[in-house]
Amino acid sequence: MESGSFPVINMELLQGSQRPAAMALLRDACENWGFFELLNHGISHELMNRVEAVNKEHYRRFREQRFKEFASKTLDSVENVDPDNLDWESTFFLRHLPTSNISQIPDLDDDCRATMKEFARELEKLAERLLDLLCEDLGLEKGYLKRVFCGGSDGLPTFGTKVSNYPPCPKPDLIKGLRAHTDAGGIILLFQDDKVSGLQLLKDREWIEVPPLRYSIVVNIGDQLEVITNGKYKSVLHRVVAQTDGNRMSIASFYNPGSDAVIFPAPALVEKEAEEEEKKEIYPKFVFQDYMNLYIRKKFEAKEPRFEAMKSMEIVMSSQPIPTA
């Protein structure tokens, strides 16, 4: 399928007469693609340029040589490489909420720390704006999705960023940049390299490239939104294909529920399905951290068994007697 059919949403169109068409595109993207790309999303080009510059410089100064040493050892024993248990990527993680760890990440200079904090603030605002647009599309009360995400004991979502580089790979037929998976969380916002491609999603049994567009933010639906919408929105398999040329930058930020937030299908959506006599199976109810504990072990496996495991846990918990003393 041509990349031109990939859903690209100009957020400026949400302000005027073309809003209905833009909202229809958003709905189609969430229901049938699990991915879309945003233009004119409110994050300045100047800030995105700084984010790209500080992260590429950080990789060059502190991580490139380490990765070359890892790659050399890996390729020297290529006959022993298990491609199902290896990703060709260099990564580090930043946590923003409920508490930040940016000051503790080694080798980050003050400019990089300040830039990434500023970027995180802008992404948080964009994620919350998107959640309200999704509420509008779903017919849910404004703020519903954010309240679910912030429904844990600290009243905050979990929000963090994975900073990745995918260096040139001499054996892309053997090793994936990142193996196929769905994302466990809520809504994912990706600032990707606009010069080196590699991100692909699975649609209709075909791997489709997510087009690298300058100054865009790629958004994808995580497993938790699939549960909350009772399957109306879908998280989809995606992967990164290793490239022989170029170093691909990927900065993915995950706006997820709080660790002890309880996730369950929105009652209003379940009731609407019942009224319309849609006989859909209802997704399970669980604590987000319980799902994450399973996901950590099963990330690169199908999502459906994870949902079934949560459903089994829900049945066991509901069958236990309630303490009276």
UniProtKB/Swiss-Prot annotation:
Molecular-function GO term, any one: metal ion binding
Family: Belongs to the iron/ascorbate-dependent oxidoreductase family.
InterPro entries to which the protein is assigned, alphabetical: DIOX_N, IPNS-like_FE2OG_OXY, IPNS-like_sf, Oxoglu/Fe-dep_dioxygenase_dom, Plant_2OG-oxidoreductases
Domain (Fe2OG dioxygenase): residue spans on this chain: 157-257
Amino acids binding Fe cation: 181, 183, 238
Organism: Doritaenopsis sp.
Listed EC numbers: 1.14.17.4
Example GO BP: fruit ripening
Catalytic reactions of this protein: 1-aminocyclopropane-1-carboxylate + L-ascorbate + O2 = ethene + L-dehydroascorbate + hydrogen cyanide + CO2 + 2 H2O
UniProt gene name: ACO2
EC category: oxidoreductase
Cofactor requirements of the protein: Fe cation
Domain of life from the UniProt record: Eukaryota
Protein name per UniProt: 1-aminocyclopropane-1-carboxylate oxidase 2
